[in-house]
Swiss-Prot record:
This is Phosphoglucosamine mutase. Belongs to the phosphohexose mutase family. It comes from the Bacteria. Coiled coil: none annotated. GO terms for biological process: carbohydrate metabolic process; peptidoglycan biosynthetic process; UDP-N-acetylglucosamine biosynthetic process. It comes from Streptococcus suis (strain 05ZYH33). Activated by phosphorylation. Its EC number is 5.4.2.10. Mg(2+) binds at S101, D240, D242, D244. GO terms for molecular function: magnesium ion binding; phosphoglucosamine mutase activity; phosphomannomutase activity.
Amino acid sequence: MGKYFGTDGVRGEANVELTPELAFKLGRFGGYVLSQHETDVPRVFVARDTRISGQMLEAALIAGLLSVGIHVYKLGVLATPGVAHLVKTEKASAGVMISASHNPAQDNGIKFFAGDGFKLDDALEAEIEALLDAEEDTLPRPSAQGLGDVVEYPEGLRKYQQFLVSTGTDLDGMKVALDTANGAAATSARQIFVDLGADLTVMAEKPDGLNINEGVGSTHPEKLQELVKETGSQIGLAFDGDSDRLIAVDENGVLVDGDRIMYIVGKYLADRGLLAKNTIVTTVMSNLGFHKALDREGIEKAVTAVGDRYVVEEMRKEGYNVGGEQSGHVILMDYNTTGDGQLTAVQLTKIMKETGKKLSELAAEVTIYPQKLVNIRVENSMKDKAMEVPAIAAIIEKMEAEMAGNGRILVRPSGTEPLLRVMAEAPTDAEVDYYVDTIADVVRAEIGS
C-alpha cells in the first residue's frame, strides 16, 4: 500500500479527505501515467455508485482525464465488476470506479482498472503517487485538438446485464428476493433476474444518494432475511454498495456467507472437472468448517492474507478460477477479473436449478464453527512482534494443543490501527470464549497499551 492508494484504491470521507481537488489530480496524473503505456490515444471508462458525492467526484476526475487528452466514456451508475468487464471486453485503455463499496454514504473512493480488467499494479500506482507528491505539476497542457472528449455510454449497462444473463440458466418458477443496498445493483439486478425468468421481489432499490448500505445490503441482511420468509422465496441475494460482494439467504431465512458460497460453486465445478487445479483460493479468515468440508471432498485450498486483492494475485499467479472471502467477495475468473456479486448470484441460482437442491441443502455441507474475534489495543511498535513474546507464544501453543485439531486460532496485527486481532473457532461458543479470552488476557498483560 502507498501513501494514497490502499488495497482498494483511494478512499476517504468525500469532500473532506477525498476532495474534488484530489479527484482532479487523480484523473490528470492517472491519465498521464496510463497514456505513457499506450500507443493510441487512451480511452477510459468511468462509472460510479449512487452516493451523493459521486457526481461531484466524477466531474472532477473526468476534468483531470480530459486535461491530458484522455477520451472518457461515461457509464453512469454501474457495479464495480461491470467496469472491469467492459474495460476488458471493449478493449479500453483503463477504467475508473468511484465508490466506497460497503462503506457509509459519507465516504467515497476512486479505483483504477488496467486494460486487462485487473486493478492497477503497485508500480503504476507508485508512478501516480510520485506525481501527486511532486512540488510542481509539470505535465503537458494540450489545447484544442489535444484535449480529450466525453462520450455518454449508457449501453455499457445493458451489455453488462446481457453478459451476466448469458452465464445463467432459465429460472422460471424460482422465487427470488433481491436486496440491492440502494447501490449500484439498483440499476441492473432486477433486469438480470427478469431476463432469467425468476419470480422477483426486490427491496432497497430506491437510492437517494444518502441511503446506500444504510441498514441494508450484504453487511445488513436482516431485512432480507425477513423478506425471504414473508414472501416464501427460495433464495435471497444481498449485494453491497458497488455490487462486488454477495451474501445469500436460504429459504428458511438463514444466512449463507462467502465461505459457503465458495464451497457450493467450487464443488459444483469440481464435480464436473471444471475447478482449475482442483483448488479454491481463500483467506486466513475462512471458517474451519469450510476447510474441513473441502478436505472431505478432496478439494485443495490456497490461503492468502485478508483482502480480495491478495486472493486475485494468487489466482492469477497459479491459474486458479475460484476464490474469495468470507465477507462475500467471490472471484470467478472464468467470467470476470474481480469479485462480482451479481455474477455470483446468477451462478448460485443456476446451481440450485440444475441440481434441484434447496440452498439450505447445498449450504448444509459446510458446518460453520462458532467464531469469535477480539481486538486488543497494543503498543504500535509491538503489534508485529507479538509472536516473539514468550508468554504469548506459549499460551497460543497451549490452546492449540488443547484443541487437538478440532479448532483454530489466528492472531494477527491490524494493518491500519495499533490493534492485535485474536480469533478462535471451535465446536461450541463456550470453547471459543475460553480460547479467545485466555489468549487475550495474556496479550493485554504483556503488551497491552
